[in-house]
């Protein structure tokens, strides 16, 4: 069993139930079906009992039953996570409610059955909503705890009027509890596992339902300059800590002049035993107290202390990024224990399942995105945005381009969601109000109430890094994704190590000489992160609703990203969506140029290689025989991109034998 924020050590002192009887599948399924019928009237827009939704319901039940079977095997139970990656808006949460209701009622009837459920959510607001829903269905048997649902909480910002108040210790008396990821994986997370049944205290709840992918690996990242700034501020407040901070700095300093440009580890030079001995203080309760007392007034103090703790475990490295050396550490916080299911719409895309055998997917129904109209537009700049957006002039230019794009692809009277980089929020560039506008003091107005107005267009805005799982914008007619959310490669590498519970001198990282060295697992996590955020945020609007055949609601998606990569993956992200390009692509690759050409809806259904050459010449002004292009573009990735826009390439013998022809899978929409 994995340690969960220290919870496992505390659970050893609790009573562990003897091997329990696996619930009778048919009896549990009957209770599950009854619970769905109880919930269904409150879901007026959909019918949970038929078609596409019913298939999702079967998937949730299958995952839940497998999880309970694992739990009943005790310590011999498989260490795995059963995953339901049904589409966003497909009813996963409603069915998880039905599962917890059915299981609780079954346990009430069967004294030898496993007992207790915990619903783990990513947001405080979501916890409050879940409590309202579940408590209405099974009154008196549900409890919730977040920092804002605590009885002694004095400052509430997420839920000013919580649906209920509890203490952590009261959770054990309720068969169903709702907590956040942060609490479940935190230092007192053991309280989520304790449950009282028939006046006896047990050490584990049988069923854990995790809503949305949790933070399975905590990353601690900083530069030497940041570390030195933090050290100076902390020494001003605590001069007695100079010696322990000096030890940390001495272990970091040698790697700031990384001549080789490679990955380095303090343990390789000094030995892990020496590093652990030098930094032992950072693992003490005293260090935790210092962090608690000063984290609010010293930015990134938790990053420095976290990196130091990671070094004591051999879970840290340094690597250059341009002219700056990045120091990276990690801590595994995997929610992998018998009896657990994960509800996450993009768990099939995020790369984790490809590198971690403990994820087990159940069969799910496939959504149809025929009502999703995608418009791909050129990027404002091909420079790295983390650097480009540091300058105020560039921020203004970027936002001006955003506004022009919104006006071009959205009609007055429509509602839209804008997703962009957090830097634009931090600088108060989004919305494009004047500096110091008092409306910035009410973020809910432009993040939730559509009070950002562009000539009659009603908009909300959010940034990458937040918003996954939110229903706040489900009435948006159009979603704008301005660029993508990339994971720095050094963080992707650390994430792989954390997911596999490996140290810096083990696994993929041990074989990498630099952060850019070839590593399939790192590639999968990096690409998976980007695809996950693209799909999750793209479907925050009307597209997240489905009919009984699994066809999504009518929505437009306007996306600015690297064209070749997007087209190569769009069929995986949004099967059967309607796609076109708009705008002028400059300095584009030949693959992207071909994609741009072939998205013209006025083209005939068949194009010979000679005709394609003429179209390329018309675009570029240069004579370009197909034979000089084909050897570079006819790749598997290009084939996926062709399929996504409704074309395929057919090889043939002789001049004019090879050609492009339309398929019937995708309908290219006219501009």
Say what each PLM segment does:
Residues 3-671:
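ASCE RecA-like P-loop NTPase motor cores
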């Amino acid at each position: 069993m994995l340690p969960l924020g220290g919870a496992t050590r505390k659970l050893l002192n609790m009573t562990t139930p003897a091997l329990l009887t696996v619930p009778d599948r048919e009896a549990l399924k009957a209770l599950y079906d009854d619970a769905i019928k109880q919930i269904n009237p409150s879901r007026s827009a959909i019918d949970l009992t038929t078609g596409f939704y019913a298939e999702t319901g079967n998937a949730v039940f299958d995952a839940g039953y497998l999880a309970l079977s694992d739990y009943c095997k005790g310590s011999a139970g498989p260490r795995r996570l059963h995953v339901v990656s049904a589409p966003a808006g497909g009813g996963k949460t409603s069915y998880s409610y039905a599962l917890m209701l059915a299981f609780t009622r079954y346990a009430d009837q069967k004294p030898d059955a496993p007992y207790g459920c915990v619903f783990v959510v990513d947001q405080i607001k979501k916890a409050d909503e879940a409590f309202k829903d579940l408590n209405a269905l099974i009154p008196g048997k549900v409890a919730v705890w977040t920092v804002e649902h605590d009885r002694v909480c004095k400052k509430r910002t997420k839920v000013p009027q919580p649906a209920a108040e509890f203490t952590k210790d009261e959770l054990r008396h309720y068969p169903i509890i709702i907590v956040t990821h942060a609490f479940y994986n935190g230092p007192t997370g053991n309280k989520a596992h304790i449950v009282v049944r028939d006046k006896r205290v047990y050490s584990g709840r049988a069923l854990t339902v995790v809503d949305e992918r949790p933070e399975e690996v905590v990353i601690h990242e900083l530069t030497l300059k940041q570390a030195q700034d933090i050290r100076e501020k902390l020494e001003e407040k605590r001069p007695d800590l100079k010696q322990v901070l000096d030890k940390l700095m001495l272990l970091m300093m040698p790697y700031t002049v990384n001549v080789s440009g490679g990955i380095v580890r303090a343990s390789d030079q000094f030995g892990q035993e020496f590093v652990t001995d030098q930094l032992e203080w950072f693992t003490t309760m005293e260090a935790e107290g210092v962090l608690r007392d000063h984290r609010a007034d010293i930015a990134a103090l938790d990053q420095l202390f976290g990196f130091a703790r990671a070094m004591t475990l051999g879970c840290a490295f340094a690597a250059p990024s341009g002219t700056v050396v990045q120091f990276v550490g990690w801590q595994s916080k995997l929610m992998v224990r018998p009896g657990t299911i994960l509800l996450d719409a993009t768990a099939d895309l995020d790369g984790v399942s490809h590198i971690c055998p403990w994820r087990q997917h159940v069969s799910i129904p496939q959504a149809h995105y025929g009502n999703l109209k995608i418009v791909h537009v050129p990027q404002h700049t091909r420079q790295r945005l983390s650097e480009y957006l540091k300058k105020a002039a560039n921020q203004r230019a970027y936002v001006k381009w955003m506004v022009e794009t919104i006006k071009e692809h959205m009609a007055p009277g429509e509602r839209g969601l804008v997703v962009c980089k957090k830097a634009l929020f931090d600088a108060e560039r989004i919305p494009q109000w004047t500096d110091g506008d008092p409306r910035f003091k009410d973020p809910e107005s432009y993040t939730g109430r559509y009070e950002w107005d562009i000539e009659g267009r009603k908009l909300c805005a959010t940034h990458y890094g937040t918003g996954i799982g939110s229903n706040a914008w489900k009435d948006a007619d159009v979603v704008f994704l301005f660029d993508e959310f990339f994971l720095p490669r050094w963080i992707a590498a650390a994430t792989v190590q954390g997911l596999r519970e490996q140290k810096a001198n083990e696994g993929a990282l041990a074989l990498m000489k630099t952060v850019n060295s070839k590593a399939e697992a790192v590639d999968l996590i990096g690409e998976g992160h980007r695809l996950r955020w693209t799909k999750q945020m793209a479907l925050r609007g009307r597209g997240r609703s489905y009919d009984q055949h699994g066809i999504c609601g009518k929505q437009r998606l306007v996306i600015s990203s690297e064209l070749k990569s997007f087209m190569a993956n769009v069929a995986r992200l949004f099967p059967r969506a309607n796609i076109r390009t708009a705008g002028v692509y400059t300095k584009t690759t030949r693959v992207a140029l071909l994609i741009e050409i072939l998205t013209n809806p006025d083209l005939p259904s068949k194009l010979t290689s000679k005709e394609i050459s003429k179209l390329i010449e018309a675009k570029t002004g240069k004579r370009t025989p197909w034979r000089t292009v084909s050897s570079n573009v006819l790749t598997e990735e290009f084939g996926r991109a062709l399929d996504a826009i409704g074309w395929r390439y057919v090889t043939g013998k002789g001049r004019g034998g090879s050609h492009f022809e339309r398929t019937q899978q995708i309908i290219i929409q006219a501009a």
